[in-house]
């Protein structure tokens, strides 16, 4: 862990998957299947995780995109983080792109928890 990571963890409470992220584990991922199929797999995975919960899942919009609102509760202090996921069609290639962001509900810094939330989510689909 470098100095910038420490400062970031004390001053930011948000992380997002970004194509330009220095860390390749914090980039959007592609998964085979339609947005609906991929959203189903995300839902199935969340249902197997004791500290994750599905708050809402929207119906596909006109472009087929599906939005999910998830939460993850930390173990020790039971802090709740909101994770917003978008599953979008990857240009009709038989795959979908998973985009997500994680936001702490409490505090000014997350000590890297939001990035860990995103890595945990995407790690299940890499």
Task: Name every feature range the model reports, one short phrase each.
Residues 1-126:
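Ser/Thr-rich, low-complexity intrinsically disordered terminal regions
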